[in-house]
């Protein structure tokens, strides 16, 4: 998912 990409921080 796109949000998951930055949520990983």
Swiss-Prot record:
GO cellular component, as recorded: extracellular region
Leucine amide: residues carrying this PTM: 9
Primary subcellular site in the record, as a coarse category: secreted
Superkingdom of the source species: Eukaryota
A Gene Ontology BP annotation from the UniProt entry: neuropeptide signaling pathway
Location in the cell: Secreted
Keywords: Amidation, Neuropeptide, Secreted
Function: FMRFamides and FMRFamide-like peptides are neuropeptides.
Entry's family note: Belongs to the FARP (FMRF amide related peptide) family.
Protein's name according to its UniProt entry: Extended FMRFamide-7
């Amino acid at each position: 998912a796109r949000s998951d990409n930055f949520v990983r921080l």
